[in-house]
Each structure stands twice: as structure tokens, then as C-alpha cells.
């Protein structure tokens, strides 16, 4: 049984790594895979299972931090300073990157404030199957609207052309995505596209902005729940973290490589199908009623 439970922990880490930064809602997938199927709370205990999810989320966050490590060093003015591509070498030498630490901080402020104010309320009242289904569906519609709009934009901006107002508006959408199932990346990438960024630029800024705030949020959660960690559960935590980190690296790099080509609508369609599937399990078979 111990081996089977370890495999379950790895599966959850894989799911987290695949979905945390994709615009499909990691929360929705965790409800489907864990709460409705694997039920980690049954072999870890409810409190330890909650802490386990924080740990595997950290695995995904560290993966994103690694992918964007050079950009973070540039933003913090550590190491070599790169420049924006221009029409010639002189332009490249004279135009520094516009994305800086203030852009990231401006984007983090709305979610940071609302997170501190409403984190406990959201944790207690909004983590249910019906609310997650609502978030999945509404988020999918928002993504479709963003993609339809982006088709009309002739010269979408790169991440280094972002201004502070755009950063702030994208930050507000990150706060809206605190509703479980809405998807942080789905919300912020869509908003970035609506603010006339190209899909890759919106994705880059989404991940860069998300890493520090998610590290802070996960760190606070661990401080609140670290006492729930049992020594016997440590193998689950380690394997789950490593699975989320490894799969997260692959998923993030693949997503960033493809997003300008495939856009958001395929993910939106997938979300709607996922809502239908969860609804059938929940309303048709009563699976997940206790969540």
C-alpha cells in the first residue's frame, strides 16, 4: 500500500506541474484528480494533504523561477544586462529593456492586497465543486473573448513594451483569479492580450509576476500549516515536489514555445469540456458531494 500511495503522490505532482501555469486551472484538476479520485486526505489526513498541495505547488513555482531565472536576474540588475532588439545594432545598444522591477511590483499589488484581506474567506467558502465549475466556465468565456479581440490587433506589443498601466490592469485580473477555477494564467494572459500584448508577452509577464507572489503566498501557507507535516509523510512531499518541478519545467517551456501559435481558444474549449465532465460526476453520480 505504501508504494501505491507514493505513486498517487507522484501523480498529483505531475498534475500540478502540468496545470499550475497553463490556463486550465490547477484547482479544477486537483478537485477532479485528488478529491474525486485519489483522495490524498484518506492516506495523509486532511490537514497533511492540504500542506502536501502547498508543497507541490512550490515545485511548479520553482520550475517557473528556473525558466525565467535570467530575466529575474536582469530585473534585479544582477549579471549581464541585455537590451531590446531594435532595427540595427545601434538601437540594440541604446535601448535597454523596459520591463523592470516596478512593472512586477505594480502587477503584484492588487492580488497581494486582496490576498491578505480575503485569503481565509476564499479558503473556507469558495473551494467547492460548484464554485470551481463556475470559475472554469466563466474563465473559458473570457479567454475566448480575448482571443477574438486579439485577431483584430495588427501590431501586438512585446513584454518589453509593457507600460505601468497595463501591468496594473493585468495585476487586477490576477486578483480576480483568486476565485478558484478561474485560473491565474488564464485570467492574466487574457487580460494582457486585451491590453494589446502578444500571447507570448502576456504569458511571460504572467509567469514573471506570478512567481514572487506565489512564493509569498505558499510561504505564508506553510508557516500556518507546517505543524501538520508528519515525518512519515516526508517521502510523499519530496516525490510530489520533484514531480511537480520536473513536469513543470517541461510544461512551461512547451507552453511558451507554442502559445503564439495555438492561442487561448483550445484551452478554453478544454475547460468547457472539463466543466461538463466534472458536472456529470458531481450532479449525475454524486462524486465529490462532500467537498
Curated annotation (Swiss-Prot):
Subcellular location field: Cell membrane
Catalyzed reaction equations: di-trans,octa-cis-undecaprenyl diphosphate + H2O = di-trans,octa-cis-undecaprenyl phosphate + phosphate + H(+)
Keyword annotations of the record: Antibiotic resistance, Cell membrane, Cell shape, Cell wall biogenesis/degradation, Hydrolase, Membrane, Peptidoglycan synthesis, Transmembrane, Transmembrane helix
Keyword Transcription: no
Topology with respect to the bilayer: Multi-pass membrane protein
HAMAP family in alphabetical order: Undec_diphosphatase (MF_01006)
Record's function text: Catalyzes the dephosphorylation of undecaprenyl diphosphate (UPP). Confers resistance to bacitracin.
Name of the protein in its database record: Undecaprenyl-diphosphatase
Organism: Staphylococcus aureus (strain MSSA476)
Amino acid at each position: 500500500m505504501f508504494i501505491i500511495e507514493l505513486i498517487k503522490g507522484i501523480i498529483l505532482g505531475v498534475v500540478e506541474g502540468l496545470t499550475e501555469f497553463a490556463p486550465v486551472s490547477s484547482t479544477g484538476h486537483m478537485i477532479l484528480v485528488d478529491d474525486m479520485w485519489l483522495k490524498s486526505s484518506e492516506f495523509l489526513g486532511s490537514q497533511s494533504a492540504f500542506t502536501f498541495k502547498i508543497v507541490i505547488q512550490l515545485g511548479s513555482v520553482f520550475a517557473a523561477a528556473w525558466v525565467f531565472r535570467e530575466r529575474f536576474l536582469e530585473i534585479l540588475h544582477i549579471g549581464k544586462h541585455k537590451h531590446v532588439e531594435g532595427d540595427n545594432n545601434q538601437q540594440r545598444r541604446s535601448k535597454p529593456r523596459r520591463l523592470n522591477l516596478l512593472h512586477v511590483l505594480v502587477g503584484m499589488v492588487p492580488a497581494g492586497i486582496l490576498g491578505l484581506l480575503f485569503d481565509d474567506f476564499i479558503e473556507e467558502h469558495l473551494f467547492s465543486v460548484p464554485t470551481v465549475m463556475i470559475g472554469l466556465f466563466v474563465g473559458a468565456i473570457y479567454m475566448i473573448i480575448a482571443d477574438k479581440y486579439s485577431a483584430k490587433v495588427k501590431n501586438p506589443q512585446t513584454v518589453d513594451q509593457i507600460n505601468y498601466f497595463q501591468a496594473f490592469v493585468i495585476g487586477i485580473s490576477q486578483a480576480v483569479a483568486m476565485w478558484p477555477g478561474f485560473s491565474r494564467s488564464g485570467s492574466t494572459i487574457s487580460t494582457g492580450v486585451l491590453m494589446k500584448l502578444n500571447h507570448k508577452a502576456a504569458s511571460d509577464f504572467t509567469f514573471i509576476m506570478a512567481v514572487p507572489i506565489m512564493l509569498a503566498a505558499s510561504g505564508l501557507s506553510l508557516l500556518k500549516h507546517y505543524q501538520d507535516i508528519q515525518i512519515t509523510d516526508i517521502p510523499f512531499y519530496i516525490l510530489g515536489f520533484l514531480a511537480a518541478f520536473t513536469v513543470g519545467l517541461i510544461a512551461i517551456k512547451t507552453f511558451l514555445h507554442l502559445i503564439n501559435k495555438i492561442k487561448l481558444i483550445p484551452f478554453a474549449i478544454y475547460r468547457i469540456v472539463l466543466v461538463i465532465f466534472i458536472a456529470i460526476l458531481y450532479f449525475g453520480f454524486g462524486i465529490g458531494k462532500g467537498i
